[in-house]
């Protein structure tokens, strides 16, 4: 807990924690080749898990829609909204600003890598929750994925196979991608 407060989750995962004269590794990065089977086995032993509706406080019954863990440590929180049920990504942002107290351990600065608010169209992210002052950045691909062809603009391209925000699940929140983000 002390190391997480001082260094943040990314640094603790990268460097481990010292206990007396030993370092306890909490994460193993993907080795640069598959020839080192010992390191590959360690990397494959990392446990990425997801909890839906995580009750994060002993003071109330508030829940997070989705929380991602690495080897038991929370690394990402998500508020997921569905415009068909009347809520958009902006409701998720307001939920973080109004209902998620940064005094709670999971929301304190650098305790998690990132907090996402997402719906079927858009994704926004913040790394520092601070009530109404919390600033969210767009985490979208842009129209035409940034290629110099019209139409230009914010948002996400149409996905013929499903949701416009599919890239978050299929490209970012994968074991390989998250491991690279943490390691680098």
What is the predicted role of each segment?
Residues 1-184:
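ATP-dependent helicase/translocase motor core
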């Amino acid at each position: 807990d002390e190391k997480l407060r001082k260094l943040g989750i990314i640094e603790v995962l990268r460097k481990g924690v010292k206990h007396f004269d030993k370092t306890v590794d909490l994460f193993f990065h993907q080795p640069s080749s598959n020839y080192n089977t010992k390191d590959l086995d360690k990397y494959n032993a990392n446990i990425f898990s997801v909890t839906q509706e995580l009750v994060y406080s002993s003071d109330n019954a508030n829940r997070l829609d989705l929380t991602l863990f690495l080897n038991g440590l929370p690394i990402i929180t998500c508020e997921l909204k569905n415009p068909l049920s009347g809520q958009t990504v902006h409701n998720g942002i307001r939920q973080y600003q109004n209902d998620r107290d940064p005094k709670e351990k999971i929301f304190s600065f650098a305790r998690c890598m990132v907090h996402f608010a997402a719906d079927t169209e858009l994704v926004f992210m913040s790394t520092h929750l601070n009530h109404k002052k919390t600033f969210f950045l767009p985490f979208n691909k842009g129209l035409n994925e940034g290629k110099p062809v019209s139409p230009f603009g914010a948002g996400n391209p149409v996905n013929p196979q499903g949701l416009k925000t599919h890239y978050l699940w299929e490209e970012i929140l994968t074991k390989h991608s998250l491991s690279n983000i943490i390691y680098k």
